[in-house]
Curated annotation (Swiss-Prot):
Residues 678-823 form the Helicase C-terminal domain. This is ATP-dependent DNA helicase Q-like 4B. Residues 478-653 form the Helicase ATP-binding domain. A motif (DEAH box) lies at residues 597-600. It comes from the Eukaryota. Mostly expressed in roots, seedlings, shoots, shoot apical mersitem, flowers, and siliques. GO terms for cellular component: nucleus. Residues 124-143, 154-179, 416-446, 1106-1150 are annotated as: Disordered. It catalyses: Couples ATP hydrolysis with the unwinding of duplex DNA by translocating in the 3'-5' direction; ATP + H2O = ADP + phosphate + H(+). Its cofactor is Mg(2+); Mn(2+). It comes from Arabidopsis thaliana (Mouse-ear cress). Residues 1029-1111 form the HRDC domain. GO terms for biological process: cellular response to cold; DNA recombination; DNA repair; DNA replication.
């Protein structure tokens, strides 16, 4: 028996008394037991309790009479005779304790106070006034009492459970004998043993009733001493015999109501029919179990299978868009739409069931608390003066909390309803909607100049943003969103997505809410807007409460200075306060539009899935009439459709721009042991002292590459997620301000970077997907200049990345899916693995154009001839030939089977090519008939064929990590379902390989287009400036120095590209503007920047020209003052014209 000290012995005292009494019975009272067979035991309980409390010692208790309470405890004829013989047993002789500590421990067990107050069902015990002080008391002890075969007892001390004092009468035992010196066991010797049919052990813990012994007692002969435990008592045996309802009725007849003896049963068939009628039509079809989908208990499994089928259909549409017939494609689209509806309806149904189940579980009190009502504490918050601390009254006592509460808290709290912490909101379930989208990239409707805002659009674009024209699709997107349409935009990095919502924000009344994934990206956008005198604000979890309140107050004002509000998706998902303010703004017609930046994060099939993005569907649910603009630079067809569905864009207009970046040069280079030396050589020969990013797989790789580049003489630093946030921010600031050239980073770096002059992006290891690789490469050359994208590939990196994916190291965020978390994690792992295999296939391909491989994956048709030798495959001088490798593929699959599917791909290649290394000999694989069958192949050719079998899922590659060395290795296994067709002759494999014949090498400039300058188009000047290349170079250097000085004078978050872009400085150095009016003709210089920095620019230009031509100083300034127009460009300013018109009207009225 295990007894735990605690405050809840009232419920278990009766069972405990019955058990102790059953150990020693008097045969003289058996006839009384038989006569009381028809009575209920509630009266006996009172007698037993009273007798138990009056016992002064154990000896008297063991010899006392006991009244049976249970039917099963009454003895039969044979057992009755055995029980009577107990009376003839001699009194027990108890020896004196040898150790006072053990005696003290045993007395502590016996002296436990027991509350014998009986409570009728539904009534909780009263709580003492001083229970608060006893709530968090010291740790107590647990004693385990076991009986030995010789009749002795053992008690073990376990100081684990908390203790509380309970009122009651104390019991004690006089003396005991110790088993051994220093042992914590207490042995009571020479006690005759009564053997019972009992089970394992009995435990009494805080707040739990101890059930009685299950079977009747039996007398047994003493055996050799061995430690056994008292049996566990079956609680069901008591409940089968005792009529609890009748006992409760007799104890409290005035407060209880008798229940009818006949139960009311529900017609389950009627209930099932009603449930079937309420099902949506999409899930009324029968599943594989022969049950309707909406009623099947395995609905979650069906959802997982449907999503797998949906992914397969999407891939089929994507991979075979140009090979399938239009009817087949339409059937696939219809099937995919039906699957989406079924999945969403089932997810809603399962979500509702899980919520009801959780509510039921919450409504049922736990076993430890259902018999006790905890003491509640009434809190009253008293607000005094705003500068004083907050006082909390808690039942008469005052608690002071040093909380710096802003002024006017009460007014602000009632008016704006803001809380200092994030408020969790129940995750909304998206409604099933029929989504239709219209491809409008070539729709002439949106290119029209008949819109009422066309003139202001062009004026603001020039004066505010300094743009003299729109980039492709910018005007069309702006016209569509300002017309009130929901718009989905697929535009490459550097295509000008930000202008499509910043310019409408200036022209439209109200606030534009922009949801952006990273705080760093938000800060970069706000700093850029501030340079153009556009007021914008942001709300994030890290901001001070008073600062958030101030921003929301300004947003709610009649004439708010803010036009754009930036928030993170987490803020929208978790802040009820923000939604309430949006509702207020919408009621006053001050909510203009929603903008979802990096919209591919919404989709689970996207390469950068963010769970909080899926909660953005609530915006369209709450504000259906507010237009939404979704922007992304990387999205496949399936991702686009998933995003549109998740955001609720019912009838959206889609603008798709080519993802081709003609200024980027792509190449894949074999990764060798001298990879770092190769990187140093590439940078020195092509981009020395220029800005670049090197992406690495792990933190260790980042630091190792950085250290090597520093040794080689480059200004480099590393950036990864394990760094201190302040250190990361400092490194990013150094790189953005050109204090360092190269940053070695993990994939956590880059999304919030808008640096235009990144000349190269190098991948030191394998990216996890083609979408991610395309986006990371897109961070190079945003200014339109030639830039390089180099990937160093090794199949070993594939093993490393796959292991990290399987361990969750490269996951896209933790799934918050509730009921189907495991299923979602499995699907996410499968999606990540498939994306990784596509990336391996991209790297292994030495034939096809790199642009073609990327763009076809993104759902865009691209003609390889338009590459113009800007990738390594197109610029290669190799002649390629097709080879049938079906026989080789069959041999490799058979070899994997022969070796027991226990070896890596590299080992299989060694065997196939006839290697006799120690590993092959040790495993006796040199005797296999396929050993050396591929000796005519080079190692790279055999490896490439084997890797192709892996990417085609004919061979599956498992990954394991060595616990001893920490290295990662792979094991090849045969996918028998996919390999059957190959082995049976139903499938053939043809691959391209380089021929041994080579053509003449092309010129160096063509082979390495990174060094070829991109032709720049410039607008003609009103007065042509003399062409002087030396002067242009000197002036460009002077202008960059001026920009550096301005950045040093500006706040920390202001970067060089916020002031002037490199393209803008180059245009100035070539065109040599001499007045502010001429500066406004430079692309990238708006009215605000000319007003801020115009004088300093012109002074720099004049001084440089004077120094170059040795002319008289000051002549330029006089010419500038003579040519300046005091009303320059103000006639085209709508705000200025409106103010002048207003003044004229007022003057006329006077």
């Amino acid at each position: 028996m295990v007894v735990t000290r605690g405050d809840k012995f009232a419920g278990s005292s009766l069972a405990c008394k019955s058990m102790i009494g059953a150990n020693k019975m008097s045969g003289s009272h058996l006839h009384e037991v038989n006569n009381s067979r028809s009575h209920f035991p509630q009266t006996n309980w009172l007698k037993v309790a009273k007798a138990f409390e009056c016992i002064p010692s154990l000896n008297k208790f063991m010899g006392s009479n006991f009244l049976y309470s249970l039917e099963s405890q009454k003895l039969g004829r044979d057992r009755e005779m055995a029980a009577r013989s107990i009376e003839n047993i001699a009194p027990v002789t108890v020896q004196t304790l040898a150790r006072p500590q053990i005696e003290k421990a045993w007395c502590t067990l016996i002296n436990l106070s027991i509350n014998n107050t009986y409570l009728r069902p539904g009534i909780t015990p009263a709580i003492d006034n001083d229970s608060t002080s006893r709530t968090s008391s010291t740790k107590g002890s647990t004693f385990k009492v076991t009986s030995n075969a010789d009749g002795s007892f053992c008690a073990h001390n376990h100081p684990e459970h908390s203790q509380r004092s309970v009122r009651g009468t104390a019991k004690s035992i006089d003396s005991f004998s110790s088993s051994s010196v220093g042992d914590n066991k207490i042995i009571i010797d020479k006690v005759p043993r009564v053997n019972y049919e009992v089970r394992d052990s009995v435990t009494v813990t805080n707040g739990m009733e101890m059930p009685p012994i299950k079977n009747s007692a039996q007398l047994a002969r003493p055996v050799e001493p061995r430690e056994v435990s008292l049996g566990e008592i079956d609680y069901d045996d008591i409940m089968e015999i005792i009529d609890v309802d009748q006992i409760a009725m007799e104890h409290c007849p005035s407060t209880c109501t008798k229940q009818p003896s006949v139960s009311k049963f529900v017609d389950i068939f009627t209930s099932r029919r009603e449930e079937e009628q309420g099902l949506p039509p999409e899930i009324c079809s029968n599943c594989s179990h022969g049950i309707k989908l909406g009623l099947c208990p395995e609905a979650s499994t069906h959802v997982e299978q449907m999503k797998d089928t949906l992914l397969a259909i999407s891939n089929e549409i994507l991979d075979n868009t140009y090979d399938l017939g239009p009817d087949h494609v339409e059937q696939l689209h219809q099937k995919r739409l039906l699957l989406k509806k079924q999945i969403q309806q089932l997810e809603i149904l399962i979500h509702n069931k899980e919520r009801k189940k959780s509510q039921c579980l919450v409504s049922i009190p736990s076993h430890n608390t259902q018999y006790e009502t905890p003491q509640t504490t009434n809190l009253e918050v008293v607000y005094g003066q705003t500068d004083s601390p907050t006082h909390v009254k808690e039942q008469g006592r005052c608690v002071t909390d040093n909380w710096n509460m802003p002024r006017d808290y009460l007014v602000s709290k009632e008016r704006y309803d803001i809380s200092s912490g994030s408020e969790e909101r129940e995750q909304s379930v998206s409604e099933v909607i029929d989504v239709t989208d219209t491809e409008s990239s070539n729709d002439k409707k949106w290119t029209s100049s008949d819109f009422p805002w066309t003139k202001n659009l062009e004026v603001y674009n020039k004066l505010v943003f300094g743009n003299h024209s729109f980039r492709p699709n910018q005007r069309e997107i702006i016209n569509a969103t300002m017309s009130g349409c929901d718009v989905f935009v697929l535009m490459p990095t550097g295509g000008g997505k930000s202008l499509t919502y910043q310019l409408p924000a200036l022209l439209c009344a109200g606030i534009t809410l922009v949801i952006s994934p990273l705080v760093s990206l938000i800060q970069d956008q706000i700093m850029n807007l501030l340079q153009t005198n556009i007021s914008a604000a942001s709300l994030s979890a890290g901001m001070e409460w008073a600062e958030q309140l101030e921003i929301l107050q300004e947003l709610s004002s009649e004439k708010s200075k803010y036009k754009l509000l930036y928030v993170t998706p987490e803020k929208v998902a978790k802040s009820e306060s923000l939604l309430r303010h949006l509702e207020i703004l919408n009621s006053r017609s001050l909510l203009a539009r929603f903008v979802i930046d990096e919209a591919h994060c919404v989709s689970q099939w996207g390469h950068d899935f963010r769970p909080d993005y899926q909660g953005l569907g609530v915006l369209k649910q709450k504000f259906p009439n507010i237009p939404m603009l979704a922007l992304t630079a990387t999205a496949t067809t399936s991702v686009k459709e998933d995003v549109v569905q998740a955001l609720g864009l019912v009838n959206c207009v889609v603008f798709r721009q080519s993802f081709n970046r003609p200024n980027l040069w792509y190449s894949v280079v074999p990764k060798t042991n001298k990879c770092l030396e190769d990187i140093d050589k590439f940078i020195r020969e092509n981009h020395f002292d220029e800005c670049g990013i090197i992406y690495c797989l792990s933190r260790m790789d980042c630091e190792k590459v950085t250290e090597a580049l520093r040794v080689f003489g480059h200004k480099a630093a590393f950036y990864h997620g394990s760094m201190d946030p302040g250190k990361r921010a400092f490194v990013q600031k150094q790189w953005s301000k050109d204090e360092i050239n190269i940053i070695c980073a993990t994939v956590a770096f880059g999304m919030g970077i808008n640096k235009p002059d990144v000349r190269f992006v190098i991948h030191h290891s394998l990216p996890k997907s083609i979408e991610g690789y395309h986006q990371e490469c897109g961070r190079a050359g945003r200014d339109g200049q030639r830039s390089s994208c180099v990937l160093y590939y090794s199949y070993t990196d594939y093993i490393r990345v796959k292991h990290m994916i399987s361990q969750g190291g490269l996951g896209q965020g933790q799934m918050k899916m509730g009921y189907n978390c495991k299923a979602s994690s499995g699907r996410m792992l499968e999606t990540n693995t498939e994306n990784l295999l596509r990336m391996v296939s991209y790297c292994e391909n030495e034939v096809d154009c790199r642009r073609f491989l990327q763009l076809v994956h993104l759902g865009e048709k691209f003609d390889s001839t338009n590459c113009k030798n800007t990738c390594d495959n197109c610029s290669s001088s190799k002649i390629l030939i097709d080879k049938d490798v079906t026989v080789i593929a069959r041999q490799l699959v058979a070899l994997v089977k022969l070796t027991g599917e226990r070896f890596s791909s590299a080992h299989i290649v060694e065997i196939y090519r006839g290697s006799l290394n120690q590993s092959v000999k040790r495993n006796r694989q040199d005797t296999l008939h396929l050993h050396g069958a591929g000796k005519h192949l080079t190692k790279s050719e055999a490896s490439r064929i084997l890797h192709y079998l892996v990417t085609e899922d004919i061979l599956a590659e498992g990954v394991k990590k060595s616990e001893l060395y920490g290295s990662v290795s792979s094991l090849l296994k045969v996918n028998r379902s996919k390999a059957a067709s190959l082995l049976s002759g139903g499938q053939s494999i043809t691959m391209r390989f380089p021929s041994t014949i080579k053509v003449s090498k092309q010129s160096k400039s063509t082979a390495n287009p990174a060094k070829v300058p991109l032709k720049q188009t410039t607008l003609p000047m009103a007065k042509a400036a003399p062409q002087d290349s030396n002067l242009s170079g000197i002036l460009l250097t002077a202008l960059k120095n001026l920009r550096t000085d301005i950045v040093k004078e500006s706040p920390d978050l202001v970067m060089a590209y916020h002031i002037f872009g490199n393209a803008t400085l180059k245009e100035i150095s070539k065109r040599l503007p001499r007045t502010k009016e001429e500066l406004l003709d430079i692309n990238g210089l708006g009215k605000a920047k000319v007003s801020k920095y115009g004088d300093r620019l012109l002074e720099t230009i004049d001084s440089t020209i004077n120094d170059h031509y040795k002319t008289r100083p000051g002549s330029g300034k006089r010419r500038r003052d003579e040519n300046v127009n005091p009303n320059v460009a103000e006639d085209d300013d709508p705000d200025w014209s409106a103010s002048q018109s207003h003044k004229k009207v007022v003057k006329n009225k006077k």
